[in-house]
Amino acid sequence: MTDSPLPRSVRRGGVVFAAVLGGLLILAVVATVWIGVRGVLAYSHLRDAQQTAAAVRENLADPAAASDAIAALAADTGAAHAMTSDPVWNLAEGLPWVGPQLAAVATVAESLDGVTSTALRPLSEVAASFQVDALKPQDGQLHLAPLQQISGAAQTASDGVGAAAASVSSIDRTALVAPVREAVDEVDALLVEAGTATDALARATQLIPSMLGADAPRDYLVLFQNNAEWRSLGGIPGAMALIHTDGGAISLAAQESSSDYPRYDDAVLPLGDEVTAIYGERPGRWIQNVTQVPDFAVSGALAREMWARQHGGQQVDGVIALDPVALSYLLEATGPITLPTGDVLAPDNAVQLLLNDVYSRYTRPADQDAFFAMAAASVFEKLSGGEVDPAALVGALTRAGDEDRLLLWSTHENEQSVLADTTLAGGLPVSDDEAARFGVYVNDGTGSKMDFYQNATTSLEWSSCALDAAGTATGDAVLTVTIGNTAPADAASLPAYITGDSAFGVPAGITRTIGYLYLPEGFELVDATMSDGTGFGGGTHDGRRVVSFAIDLPPGGSTTATLTARASEPVAATLEAVTTPTLTPPAAVAAVCGGS
């Protein structure tokens, strides 16, 4: 054997180095296999969890079944979390390329495990004995104890889901490969959906018992908005009712018409200079105009004061508003209702009957009011008597709330704070990290019910924009609003109560619409045009630029308002528009910088 020319110490060092290198390679291979095996197992558990989550969603109307599914879900998410949180996995998260993939999977697994083990599972254990029929009134009374019992767990669940959603939302997607990125996006969307549901449940369990008189009797003024005569928040308050609650018992205490109210010489409450500059004092002088200001806290306070002036100073605890479209959703839960007149009020005819046919049938306003009161009382009797599918009722109320057709204002500060950032509050459009929001509000100026034949179409786009590293945008946004009159050519021959009979100087058959367009906070107006060549008014409302217009349309006519607004400082990349709820279900109005 030929001796190596290298010294013995060097040869020995080389052997040691080779041994160490070999050991490291072996460890790397073992670690890779370890991570791979655990990754496959974690993936399997997460896929099982996805299927189980679907079962949870399907069984929400059956809390006991949902509880079993959540227990299985917790087992899978717990296993996935365990597979992706050991020291080897954690160490590998620091590696280039593969590290971000592993870190994202670990964050998702940890977040889902946290949701199921500390949020949904405790809620499901409490709710397992909760029957959905508990939401069904019996003989005019709703038992409040079941809702009160799950309140704490509901809040814990809401907090837990919110924390998990924030964790997954913070994952940097830029370094992720497509399959991992898509999975993260899917979980992100799922947690947002779950967060919405648990937040709504937590708020409901806080609000409903107190509103139904758990602590003391309550009185609520209900405004039925008439979408055939537009106002910013839906329509003029036509029919009205007083609801009394006490210990879960619900009763219809009084019914009235807005025609019973006078025109006040001055606004019943101070409106403030900004509101008065845009709307004048009309919202504070006529109860039919309280919903002209697109802020239901203002509308509710005005209606409450007018009620008090008409009823010896009686102060209601809150004001609720809903419209006939929301009523049609409720009829899906109650089933058709036969009225004393023989008419059958059903989901597919309620809007037509209440907002158009009634004016052809009854020429005297007093008779119209009597019909509305009868219809409202019949629906209330069916709901309070428990003749309702509770799951369908929850769905109907949720849909009405999502479409801004159900609004609520409370005089109790703790309750109003719970409502404040929900659609039920009916507040001005608020921009946040998710979206910059415009407001599009339409109002009748004819003094008629011609808006039954009108439509309002809104679109948004970024005409130019730039995204920064944080994902926020600057640039120019274009808001387009088209008002169309679809009334028949002989609209002038319609009943006088529908056309307005020229009471406000608008010829019969013509519609007059006043629009108020709110820019998001921080946006400046660049340009504004009307397709008919008319001009604009406006002002500023609570930090938002407001542009107003007025148009008269013959049957078949339409006019378009186009605004260009600039965001010079970074805002959310998504644009959205909040619009007046009309007779048709609203279409989503949104635009994304750099997307569709």
Task: Cite the ranges covered by each PLM segment.
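Terminal targeting segments of Actinobacterial cell-envelope proteins
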Residues: M1-V16
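Hydrophobic membrane-insertion alpha-helices, especially the h-region
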Residues: A18-W34
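Non-catalytic, solvent-exposed segments at the cell envelope interface
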Residues: W34-A587, C593-S596
